[in-house]
Amino acid sequence: MSLLELDGVKVHFPVKKGLLFDRTVGHVYAVDGVSLSVEAGQTYGLVGESGCGKTTLGRAVLRLNDITEGAVVFDGTDLAKLPSEEMRAFRRRLQMVFQDPLGSLNPRQNIESILAEGMAAHGIGKDAAERRKKIESILAKVGLPSNAMSRYPHEFSGGQRQRIGIARALVLEPDVIICDEPVSALDVSVQAQVINLLEELQESLGLTYLVIAHDLAVVRHISDVIGVMYLGGLVEEAPSDALYAGPRHPYTKALMSAVPVPDPEVEDRRERILLHGDLPSPANPPTGCRFHTRCPWVQETKCATERPPLLDTGDGHKVACHFTAEIEAGTVKQTLATGIEAVTGTETVAAEAVETAEGEAGTEAPVKEPATVPAQADADATEKAAAVPAQADAEAKEKAAAATEKVADATERTEGGPKA
């Protein structure tokens, strides 16, 4: 049995209107029917573009957001139905590392106070001295010195603050840690350090991770299984290597085509899938398949009317698409432009293709006149070159004559003036 299992989880936020008497006029369907399972000791990566509901789903697992419908089963217990007092005990075993390390740390508390607060709330450690000793041990595991306990969050770098956030989760000895964009706010060099730290802690402590991210390279490096979310739903799930080797959902294909390839020759040859339009509003999602408004392979049947279930297509690879097999076999053709056509338009690209084909078909090149044109050009150039100095000499002589006349006039005036 899985350590953490989600079954049809929905998180809908009501949209209210009115000054005195609030009335619900609609809902934001942030998470709309997500089912997944995470095995003990496994890392499950959840990816998708901004606004697809990844963070909301992670917070719903911890009951930081109320669950509208569905079940969150942790170690055999449905957390969605637990009273608040009973849920308190499970929160120690489920911890979260937040996206913004500075915003999640109290600026008025030093590090020892921040880490000891959770321990005291859950009764970990007999007294302050024992808790202090455990905090020193945890800080050493995340690569921070013991003198960090007396310092405040603003005195640390971004990477160090994220390590403090990880330490805060570890002091409670959790079974599952939900990492919400753990490295998105950090430099690339620091990202590698934090990812390696998470892997080392998983090996030494037997932790289970649910990693939420939009960086596909980070998710591939750390995850065993990857789920792809789009507009509140899971559209594809597969083992990490299988997903990157052969994505099957049109949305996943578009995501993977956006990942740059270091080899320039491969980068130039591979297909680039550009999607039309923006992510639809979760307050008014499309009917049928959520992705059909942007899908390059959209069909007139089913796509706009029936929402596809997430089905296993073999080897643990699950896809939510009506035409997965047909797209893979090539029997369903693209109905929307995807490459440069999506930017310049299909008519422009078609016209350029016709011109190229006509050029390659081989109209005879015009015969050039033999050497007469260059000879004429040389003669013209020589004539112009000779004319320029002659014209310059004439202008110089005119200016000299004018200057001589002015001097003569001035002399006559001087000689003809009154004598002393």
Language-model region placement:
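Conserved ABC ATPase signature
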Residues: Y152-F156, Q160
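A short, proline-enriched helix->beta-strand linker immediately N-terminal to the Walker B motif
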Residues: V171-D175
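Short catalytic/signature loops enriched in Gly
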Residues: V15-D22, P239-E347
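ABC ATPase NBD coupling module
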Residues: L20-T24, L79-Q95, A121, A128-A129, ...
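Conserved ABC transporter NBD signature motif
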Residues: G70-D78
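P-loop NTP-binding/switch modules centered on Walker-like glycine-rich loops
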Residues: V176-I178, P182-L186, V190-D268
